[in-house]
Each structure stands twice: as C-alpha cells, then as structure tokens.
C-alpha cells in the first residue's frame, strides 16, 4: 500500500512539472532565433520579462506567442513565462 501511494505521488508530481511546459506550448514548432542582445529567444515555459524575449511559432497565423503572468506553486506566487497557444483557443 505504501509503495503504491508513493508511486501515485511521484506520477502526479511528474505530470505537474512536465505537463506545465506542454500547456505553455513547448511542443508547438517554433523558431529559435538570436535576439539583438546576442542571446537566443526563450522557449515556452522559460521565465521572461517582456514579449520580445520569447520565441515565435513557425505558423504565426494559427498560433500566438508572448510573455504572460502564470501561477507557480513551486515559486509560491505569480511568475512571468513565455507561451505559445492556438489563436482560436479560449486559453490564449
């Protein structure tokens, strides 16, 4: 019983941590470009301070990208993260 409970907790934590990046559009094809400051653009799920730092989707007609404030249980508050989502999605 203890082993099963431990496995369930592990799976739940793994899904919460890994699933968060996928919810932010990590699996959507995007362009990895160099910014004017010489750094690469930030991928979905990375922390950001403004929209220009984030990578843009390959298909910009279907997908929108940017930097938005989201809740982070690990940080214990709100953080700003890059995202890519479908324009037609109600979550975007």
UniProtKB/Swiss-Prot annotation:
The presence of a 'disulfide through disulfide knot' structurally defines this protein as a knottin. The lineage of its organism: Eukaryota, Metazoa, Ecdysozoa, Arthropoda, Chelicerata. Its main location: secreted. Keywords: Disulfide bond, Ion channel impairing toxin, Knottin, Neurotoxin, Secreted, Signal, Toxin. InterPro entries: Cys_Knot_tox. Residues 1-19 form the signal peptide. This is U21-hexatoxin-Hi1a. It comes from the Eukaryota. Belongs to the neurotoxin 21 family. Potent insecticidal toxin with probable ion channel impairing activity. In vivo, reversibly paralyzes all flies within 30 minutes, even at low dose (0.3 nmol/g). Expressed by the venom gland. It is found in: Secreted. One of its GO terms (molecular function) is toxin activity. Disulfide bonds join 41-55, 48-67, 54-82, 85-92. Pfam families: Cys_Knot_tox. GO terms for cellular component: extracellular region.
